[in-house]
């Protein structure tokens, strides 16, 4: 590669994209700056300049659960509290993310006021149900909005439904509870990837408010994320069931 072009890559990374991983940097640089070099060449240039660390080979992965075959058969809902707005240091926000199990597509991702409140969860679910339909099942952790737990660390009381639980029963959506971080893997991996990418993109875009971040998520980030990480389900049949606005008002 011409030395001048390699220097351009290094300068671009130093001045605008420091902190991005190599793959993310390549995608953004191709889209925004017309970069044409291969991932391997860019990685070697950045590593050679000491701008990114060489990654150790990964150990053997634990066998992961096979995804559901149909789009809409199972969706995951997870909240992540994090300093999403790097230009507003010290301020934490909660992001709610809903991910389809079969396709890995993000169906909903927004920063919400007040953390994982029942109102925020209901808003997120309503948007997904209105846009996509009723999923077969919803996978969540054992947060207070999801399930009644008499004492800390005790088993959930499935006979005492929360407001969200009652809504799921009424709509015929199975509610699956995760009992460990490993069990919630798919949504938490999506959140981890979101953290690694979104924080950097919001910083580069100069975004300082939750409203602007949510607009960026809807208009730019989620479509790009799904195009990059989404996959074709094993069964092309959609399991989402259309739902009318009247049904959600019940």
Predicted features, each with a name:
Residues 24, 41, 124, 162-163, ...:
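Short Gly/charged-rich anion-binding patches and loops
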Residues 194-250:
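Active-site-proximal acidic segments at structured loop/helix or strand boundaries
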Residues 12, 28, 45, 107, ...:
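Generic alpha-helical secondary-structure signal
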Residues 1-83, 152-155, 159, 238-246:
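Basic, flexible linker segments flanking DNA-binding modules
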Residues 32, 128, 224, 228:
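Short alpha-helical functional segments enriched in proximate histidine and acidic residues
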